[in-house]
Design a protein with these regions (language model features):
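Small/polar-rich, solvent-exposed N-terminal microdomains that initiate assembly or binding
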Residues: 1-67, 106-122, 136
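Residues forming well-ordered secondary-structure scaffolds
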Residues: 12, 16, 94, 98, ...
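A broad, low-specificity signal marking well-ordered, structured residues that form hydrophobic/aromatic
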Residues: 52-55, 77, 124, 144
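Oligomerization/assembly interface segments of phage tail-like spikes and tubes
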Residues: 70-86, 139-150
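A structural detector for beta-sheet-dominated domains
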Residues: 45, 57-59, 127-132, 149
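Glycine-rich, aromatic-bearing surface loops/beta-hairpins
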Residues: 126-145
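Extracellular/virion structural assembly segments
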Residues: 67-74, 83-106
């Protein structure tokens, strides 16, 4: 079998992001504490039992073929964030800020592929941030769309 340089690394990247988001613990510069409620699978708000919670999902993946057999891979990742607070808008804004900070601090994210090799993303870009704007209060739902280049 040949060395698989260009295999998909979807789940490995999502798992590495989950590990980083679990560091949001209300200490230091963090404004929120997720108490480890971070999952590599999306849930809808009516399925979430523990708040606050962060759920991730790997979406579509594309390739950009370069010269010399090199290709860039682009993975879309959806991050859905749930809070239940008296002031859900404020709690959601704080947690969104924490998630954004983790993404920005880890744009060159280290992860391990299926063969056990340490890899790095080239760049993680936030494409959009959206919220329910308080419509579901005391629940709050936010969504961040990422593009991961690896």
């Amino acid at each position: 079998m040949s060395n698989r340089l260009y295999t998909t690394r979807r789940q490995s990247i999502v798992d590495a992001l989950v590990t980083k988001f679990k560091d949001i613990n209300g200490t230091g510069d963090f404004l929120s504490n997720v108490y480890g409620n971070v999952s590599p699978r999306l849930k809808f708000w009516d399925e979430v039992e523990d708040f606050p919670a962060i759920h991730l999902n790997a979406g579509s993946e594309t390739r950009d073929y370069q010269g010399g057999g090199y290709k860039d891979r682009f993975l879309s990742v959806t991050i859905r964030i749930y809070v239940r607070e008296e002031d859900a808008v404020d709690a959601l804004d704080k947690l969104l800020e924490d998630v954004e900070s983790v993404v920005e601090d880890n744009s060159r994210l280290q992860y391990t592929d299926r063969q056990g090799n340490v890899q790095y993303t080239q760049q993680i870009t936030i494409l959009s941030i959206d919220t329910d704007e308080g419509v579901l209060e005391p629940l709050g739902v936010g969504e961040i769309l990422l593009e991961v280049r690896y």
